[in-house]
């Protein structure tokens, strides 16, 4: 982690594949690989792990990196257009496109959305919506070009400390907690803290005196017993607002706990107790 500092390292391998090293808290994210697959269920293979570790060794030959240093691996499936003329998967375009099939057995065309990524999903959605509106003979009545996503709304770019101090005073919460949640959720931290400041009186009968890991189940400002960076009320807020169905949803898809290597059986048990009444039965 010290070797890259706060810089991202980007280079292209001889086979055309891109390799990235990104600082992530006290760790480093290393990626990526491109393998053609036919099934929706995938995992990071030993071959890919070996390849990426070798690439790191090329850039930092003086640093020993072993599989035992890996905290977390992730694999996803990205739909790309068929292009048999390319020698490697890395050479296939990532640009988004909507292939419209006009002649179908139905009374409407079929839109086939291919490619794209997180950085272009809003633009892609706008283009497809315009195409759909044109087919329906309708015109656009609004757009989201200037709509800020999530915690970027009303972000205090020049007065961050004042924002933190103000929220801490309004909700009688330690400013260190506010700062931590602000770093995690941006201005969305205000809603999280508001929720954390509310009592859990409705849970008296369910919790009783069976306190989990010595946590007070009625104090939502209490940190978790297994991960002190997260709080009881925060977990419940995310579980409710982000429509968590399984505990794993929170660990892997609503937080960075898995990526930081903090996914343990003890944590899962604790989270299950905290959000049990919010999960679908």
Task: Report residues per predicted region.
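C-terminal catalytic lobe of FAD-dependent flavoproteins
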Residues: 1-30, 34-213, 217-263, 267-280
